[in-house]
Design a protein with these regions (language model features):
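Terminal output helix/cap of sensory domains in signal transduction proteins
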Residues: 24-50
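Catalytic-core segments of nucleotide cyclases and related cyclic-nucleotide turnover enzymes
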Residues: 72, 145, 222-253, 258
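PAS and related sensory helical modules
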Residues: 3-25, 33
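GGDEF/GGEEF active-site signature
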Residues: 37-40, 157-227, 232, 254
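Per-ARNT-Sim (PAS) sensory domains and their PAS-associated C-terminal
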Residues: 40-65, 75-77
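Conserved long alpha-helical elements within nucleotide-processing catalytic cores of c-di-GMP signaling
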Residues: 97-101, 110-131, 138-168, 174-178, ...
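Signal-transducing coiled-coil linker helices
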Residues: 61-104, 112-122, 172-175
Length: 258
């Protein structure tokens, strides 16, 4: 792609490419401004942008770079733009990234990925009231010892699906390891008894290959509304979990920010 911009002002160049990109409906909406900024030298390339195939919901991924060539009077004369299709490599890299963020058994976020996502969310929403739930399966070792680890794994997978079903799509569910899970509830109200009761009261919906298995969970909950980090809020919620354990299990304990 070669565009002659001789004697055009920067404003004219900007408007020209803004119109061009805005009218190119196949480019992802959130990527259009990057292309405009690249051509007007507001950012350096290469950039990555996504573009739908015409008449299809499938898309390709491309890199785009632009170089401005100046004449002897130091006036911008030509923009040379080069694009390369990196769709296959991009999807492979994205797939590997997704795998690195997920627990291999339950496909929930693993601790490292979940911790990072929660910390970033709190930084961006420091005044919002959120809650962290730490939970585990009561007497999970007995399930493994009695029925075997395959059944134990089946229970972990079923509980992971259960937690996803009974939380909002924007909430974050993490498998910490073993039988311990974390649920991060975004933008909650003061009264958390309803969501906690919902999680506790529908466990009988979980069906396993061994129908005779009965289990319960214990939960610790911490709600807060200022900027904190995952390690701090996890410690408080984890303390609440152990309070539930000392109170006989199959219950939850809520701690509120002081």
């Amino acid at each position: 792609m070669i565009i002659d911009i001789l004697k055009q002002s920067k404003k004219q160049i900007y408007d020209h490419y803004l119109d061009y990109v805005s009218s190119k409906s196949t480019v992802f909406e959130e990527d259009k401004q990057k292309i405009v900024d690249l051509f007007t030298q507001k950012i350096k390339g290469p950039i990555i942008y996504r573009e739908y195939y015409r008449g299809s919901q499938e898309y390709c991924v491309k890199t785009l770079d632009a170089t401005v060539i100046y004449n002897s009077n130091d006036e911008a004369e030509i923009i040379l733009a080069t694009a390369s299709d990196i769709t296959v490599n991009w999807h492979e890299q994205n797939s590997l990234k997704q795998q690195a963020q997920r627990d291999s058994l339950t496909h929930l976020y693993n601790l490292e990925a979940g911790k990072y996502i929660i910390d970033e969310y709190i930084k961006k929403n420091p005044k919002q009231q959120n809650a962290l739930i730490v939970l585990d399966i009561d007497h999970f070792k007995e399930v493994n010892d009695t029925y075997g680890h395959l059944v134990g794994n089946e229970l972990l997978i079923a509980l992971a699906k259960y937690l996803l079903f009974h939380t909002n799509p924007n909430d974050i569910v993490i498998r910490m390891g073993g039988d311990e899970f974390v649920v991060f509830l975004k933008n909650v109200h003061d009264d958390l008894t309803y969501p906690c009761n919902q999680l506790m009261s529908h466990l009988n919906e979980i069906s396993l290959s061994h129908h005779g298995i009965h289990f319960s969970i214990s939960m610790g909950v911490y709600t807060f509304s200022n900027e904190q980090n995952f390690d701090n809020i996890f410690k408080i919620a984890d303390d609440a979990l152990y309070h539930s354990k000392r109170n006989g299990r199959n219950c939850y304990t809520i701690k509120y920010q002081k």
